[in-house]
Amino acid sequence: MAINAGSSSLKFQLLNMPEEELVTKGVVERIGLGDGIFTIEVKGEKVTETFDIPDHAFAVKTLLEKLTSHEIIQSLDEIEGIGHRVVHGGEKFNDSVLITDEVIQGIEECNELAPLHNPANIVGIRAFKEVLPNVPAVAVFDTAFHQTMPESSFLYSLPYDYYKEFGIRKYGFHGTSHKYVSQRAAELLGRPIEQLRLLSCHLGNGASIAAIDGGKSIDTSMGFTPLAGVTMGTRSGNIDPALIPFIMEKTGQTANEVINTLNKKSGLLGVSGFSSDLRDIEEQAGEGNDRAELALEVFTSRIHKYIGSYAARMSGVDAIIFTAGIGENSTVIRERVLRGLEFMGVYWDPSLNQVRGKEAFINYPHSPVKVLVIPTNEEVMIARDTVRLAQ
């Protein structure tokens, strides 16, 4: 079972392994807010119920009860492992790990690096431990895949002591997604991943680019936090750090308020002035809205900077991968990103680029650099690691 616990939500998928076959999936929302929503897929149909879900432990008990009452499983003994998504593993965890009390303590020590996410992930881990104490549980970290980055990639040009004393460095995120699509790309290309130089573009409301050389992440666009890198739905991506005191002075905001603006009111929303949803922006740009068009241009130009930079880092590229909500579904963004990359050996086919939400090659056969659309599947990656470590 793959689990993604948020502060007031719990997403779950039950998979048959090693077939990687989805049995059911669902989400528990509004935990602790008085009007909980429980949604589960039963025989391909969504079943939604509304009732008070006071805490995560209650959510877990309800989930396990529903799995048996809907006859999705006959007995809880069928659950052989639980994989938990954990956002931040810092430098402590460079791979997924079997959860012990020491591991939970290690995750807690990373809380200051991800104050919104890690505590919620721990609550999910503890809730399952309470209800299914004998089922092996595995922590799968968003940051672990990027722990192969060399120091020259992850270090900021700050006093070196800041890194040693406070752990200030680039960590990178979306690692589970980048790992999944890079492995899948190698399968689709029919080549050993050790021989491939891949550019993975995880483009969703949060977005990051990763340079993957020989199956290892050597650089990625997000940084110490997921605020860095390319323009995103509501996040600014990279800005000049001296802007923070300047904005404070001009607007009267505190430092935390400015960070909140950079996280929640910037990006596509900030530039367009009306939406963080790329579908709305594409529609408005098509109707001649200049700010919407500008938002698309800014979004694309930031992605180009990373593609060029990472191609140079790897001395070339064998394939470019598009994944996540925008990468998998936006023909417009893929076209804008790929347009002008012929100098790198990227020749893409506009008719093949019409694909949405499924695996496909969208390059011409003669293109030296292949271009793939691969729907990400972080849950399968979590399940694979759970099987690997729980046996």
Swiss-Prot record:
It comes from the Bacteria. It catalyses: acetate + ATP = acetyl phosphate + ADP. It is found in: Cytoplasm. Mg(2+). Can also accept Mn(2+). GO terms for cellular component: cytoplasm. The active site is at D142. Substrate binds at R85. Keywords: ATP-binding, Cytoplasm, Kinase, Magnesium, Metal-binding, Nucleotide-binding, Transferase. GO terms for molecular function: acetate kinase activity; ATP binding; magnesium ion binding. The keyword Transferase applies. One of its GO terms (biological process) is acetyl-CoA biosynthetic process. Pfam families: Acetate_kinase (PF00871). Disulfide bonds: none annotated. The record marks H174, R235 as: Transition state stabilizer. Its EC number is 2.7.2.1. Mg(2+) binds at N4, E378. Its cofactor is Mg(2+); Mn(2+). ATP binds at K11, H202, L203, G204, N205, G206, D277, L278, R279, G325, I326, G327, E328, N329. Pathway: Metabolic intermediate biosynthesis; acetyl-CoA biosynthesis; acetyl-CoA from acetate: step 1/2. Belongs to the acetokinase family. Catalyzes the formation of acetyl phosphate from acetate and ATP. Can also catalyze the reverse reaction. HAMAP family: Acetate_kinase. This is Acetate kinase. The lineage of its organism: Bacteria, Bacillati, Bacillota, Bacilli, Bacillales.
